[in-house]
Amino acid sequence: NMGNEILESFLQHGFTSAGYFYDDVNFNKGFPTEEKVVHSIRQQSEAVYAILLYLKYEKSQGRKHTEWENHIKKILDGFIKLQKKDGNFARKFHDDGSDIDASGGSTPSATSALVMGYRYFGKKQYLEAARRTIDYLEKNIISKSDYFSSTLDANCEDKEAAISAVTANYYMASVTKGKERQRYIDLCQKAAYFALSWYYLWDVPFALGHYAAAPFHQLHLFFVDADD
């Protein structure tokens, strides 16, 4: 019941005038005015992804949510308009679609949402837009091993960009065949190897009370973040 109430609340209050999800709401100050709305392509994509999983489950149970479907289609149609000529998406944008942060490193976040939209709605434009994101990723990110701009806060190099690239190519491989599919598998593998480089083995002492403290000479596997 609580989950349904949350979703119903989003239907009533969770969308901007342009049809996107509100990324951030301060309930002490109220909803941001239209000119102060800031959207992140990652947050919008992850929200679409989550709702499509919900809709897929509901559909399997014989339940249909037309209003939700219309909202998600509107957002995905908006993605097609937001996409640049080279296939990338601005990291952050205004409600009217104009760029706030034009960096394209968050582009793979949109790939998975577009592929899921294609599988759910059967709209080929979503798949074509997803294909173009991979063209951008291969040329500007994966081939250069320069994974950046996928965090929600800082615009920096980070493991999240590599993980997003892995996921994007995995999803593309799931809906394609032959040489095209193999291309995505190869790119997925390259990005996965880079993501692994953010993991290190440490054999060093840590101060007592530190979350990593353990007997000296014991090997630890730690996740190393750009913020650490």
Show which residues each predicted segment covers.
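Glycan-recognition and catalytic cores of secretory/periplasmic carbohydrate-active enzymes
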Residues: 1-228
